[in-house]
């Protein structure tokens, strides 16, 4: 796609070469492109940025009411990945990928309005991003109760548990559930855990399941519709 694109600009080249050396440039280039787009579009009432925390958000904030969504501070992801990574090569790659955090650490304290989904995240944002608590507004995640509601037609299966994992990284907390299954399986041999998510082949979750010897007690489901969930 890069080589086929005509009229490449600085962000295109920056994105391409930073990705080549193992970085994650999209946070920065997204902000630059958003700023360029909004410079000729003044009809918007406000702007919501979903955690890019790019330098351009400082400028956009001067032109529009800006709401900065931070689900959780990504320095925690880096912290956990480095903790569980094995080998200097893997750790070097992780540090390179998270290099955009230098930018986010500078931008976050300058945001006027930050939205967080929980008090726990709010506390972490203050801790890791050094943001004034008065700038952070907690708005809990919502759920569509027209879709996700009790279904009386489906009977409950004893000892069957369901959980979700949006990414195969220790931060998501699936480790604790898997270790709990390992403890409970002796007392409840029919226990079964269904994980809505996809583990990386040979990744952290697969290795832990193999180490605990609970393959027969855990299964994964992916690409489900809302109704199937």
State each model region's role.
Residues 1-32:
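A conserved catalytic-core segment of Leloir-type glycosyltransferases
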Residues 36-37, 74, 91-114:
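Membrane-proximal helix-turn-helix segments that form the acceptor-binding/catalytic region
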Residues 37-56, 65-67:
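Short N-terminal targeting/anchoring amphipathic segment
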Residues 46-48, 60-86, 90:
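Active-site proximal beta-strand in glycosyltransferases
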Residues 120, 142:
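Carbohydrate-associated surface elements
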Residues 154-172, 178-181, 194:
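Conserved donor-binding/catalytic core segment of Leloir-type glycosyltransferases
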Residues 164-165, 190-206, 222:
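Glycosyltransferase donor-sugar binding loop
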Residues 203-228:
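Nucleotide-activated donor-binding/catalytic signature segment of Leloir-type glycosyltransferases, i.e.
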């Amino acid at each position: 796609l890069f080589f086929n694109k005509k009229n490449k600009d600085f962000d295109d080249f920056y994105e391409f070469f930073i990705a080549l050396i193992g970085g994650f440039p999209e946070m920065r280039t997204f902000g630059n492109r958003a700023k360029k787009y909004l410079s000729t579009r003044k009809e918007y009432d406000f702007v919501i940025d979903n955690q890019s925390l790019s330098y351009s958000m400082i400028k956009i904030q001067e032109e529009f009411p800006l709401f900065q969504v931070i689900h959780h501070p990504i320095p925690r992801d880096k912290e956990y990945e480095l903790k569980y990574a094995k080998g200097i090569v893997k750790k070097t790659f992780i540090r390179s990928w998270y290099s955009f955090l230098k930018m986010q650490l500078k931008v976050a304290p300058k945001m006027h309005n930050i939205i967080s989904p929980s008090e726990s995240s709010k506390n972490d944002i203050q801790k890791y991003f050094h943001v004034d608590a008065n700038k952070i507004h907690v708005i809990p995640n919502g759920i569509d109760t027209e879709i996700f509601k009790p279904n009386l037609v489906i009977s409950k299966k004893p000892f069957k548990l369901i959980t979700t994992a949006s990414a195969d990284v220790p931060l998501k907390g699936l480790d604790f559930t898997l270790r709990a299954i390992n403890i409970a399986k002796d007392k409840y041999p029919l226990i079964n855990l269904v994980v809505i998510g996809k583990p990386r082949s040979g990744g952290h979750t697969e290795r832990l399941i193999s180490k605990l010897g609970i393959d027969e007690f855990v299964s994964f489901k992916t690409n489900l519709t809302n109704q199937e969930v």
